[in-house]
């Protein structure tokens, strides 16, 4: 290990100016370090693993971006803030567990971590939102079980996670934003009854989906939401959302709805095939 342990009892912040003495292949951040500032270890390809102190509270923007050989981290239990792109382009990182104190995963936090195959959340997670492109192009992810506290999955959060074939959504989830699961490998989809917004292209080109049921509280269905899902046979909508965008499915698919409903009229106007529910 490189230099570790506290040099004094006084807490301090690691920056680009004072990080040199701790930089090494297997890093152990001092126990009295409470924060790592932006870009502190940016593009430091020498780093293979990092041990953070339990009580560290903040990791800044791009703090470890581009650490191409970093394969092992254990995020601190007391972490309350993670900066934009903190671990993006860490192409060797294999495993991440999101600690309980983190309420938001910011933009591009783990973007392009191509070997990330194991993503877990603390059993007592307080996570509310996953930010834009947070896990985009994490091409080794196969399964994600989201925590019960989660309410929003933002734009492109899991964009082009091509091997992601299984997700489990919590009952409190309200928003799935634009291109959130664009071009993912999902084999099936069970959306939460709490869901209110399915935004534009949310599941665009998820080519393994065959049958999807829209939950009753969804009030907004954005355009192209299931467009490009070439194996999709049926989209079932049993209620009338406030808004329905254009080309929500391919022409080859069929929408199942009630005769005379707003969805029925939408199908007549757009030329989509319809099958009536009884």
Q: Where would I find each of the regions flagged by the language model?
A:
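Residue-level signal for alpha-helix termini/capping positions
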Residues: 41-42, 249
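A structural signal for leucine-rich repeat
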Residues: 111, 123-125, 136, 159, ...
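Consensus positions within tandem repeat domains that build extended binding/scaffold surfaces
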Residues: 37-40, 60-63, 83-86, 106-109, ...
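A short alpha-helix capping/helix-coil boundary motif
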Residues: 15-19, 64, 86, 110, ...
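Structural signature of tandem-repeat unit edges
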Residues: 1-13, 20-35, 45-58, 68-81, ...
């Amino acid at each position: 290990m490189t230099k570790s342990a506290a040099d004094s009892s006084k807490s301090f912040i690691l920056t680009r100016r004072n990080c040199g003495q701790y930089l090494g292949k297997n890093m152990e951040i001092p126990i009295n370090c409470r924060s790592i500032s932006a870009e502190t270890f940016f593009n430091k390809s020498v780093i293979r693993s990092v041990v953070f102190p339990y009580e560290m509270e903040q990791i800044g923007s791009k703090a470890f971006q581009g650490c191409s050989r970093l394969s092992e981290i254990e995020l601190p239990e007391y972490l309350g803030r993670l900066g934009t792109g903190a671990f993006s382009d860490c192409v060797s990182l294999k495993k991440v567990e999101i600690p309980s104190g983190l309420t938001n995963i910011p933009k591009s936090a783990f973007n392009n971590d191509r070997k990330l195959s194991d993503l877990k959340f603390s059993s007592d997670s307080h996570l509310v939102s996953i930010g834009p492109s947070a896990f985009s192009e994490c091409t080794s992810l196969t399964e994600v079980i989201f925590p019960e506290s989660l309410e929003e999955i933002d734009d492109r959060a899991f964009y082009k996670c091509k091997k992601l074939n299984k997700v489990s959504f919590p009952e409190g989830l309200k928003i799935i934003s634009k291109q959130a699961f664009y071009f993912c490998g999902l084999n099936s989809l069970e959306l939460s009854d709490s869901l209110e917004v399915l935004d534009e292209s949310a599941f665009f080109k998820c080519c393994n989906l065959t049958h999807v049921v829209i939950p009753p509280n969804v009030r907004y269905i954005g355009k192209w939401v299931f467009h490009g899902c070439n194996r999709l046979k049926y989209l079932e909508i049993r209620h009338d959302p406030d808004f329905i965008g254009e080309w929500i499915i391919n022409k080859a698919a069929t929408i199942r709805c009630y005769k005379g409903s707003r969805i029925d009229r939408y199908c007549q106007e757009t030329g989509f095939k319809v099958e009536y529910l009884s």
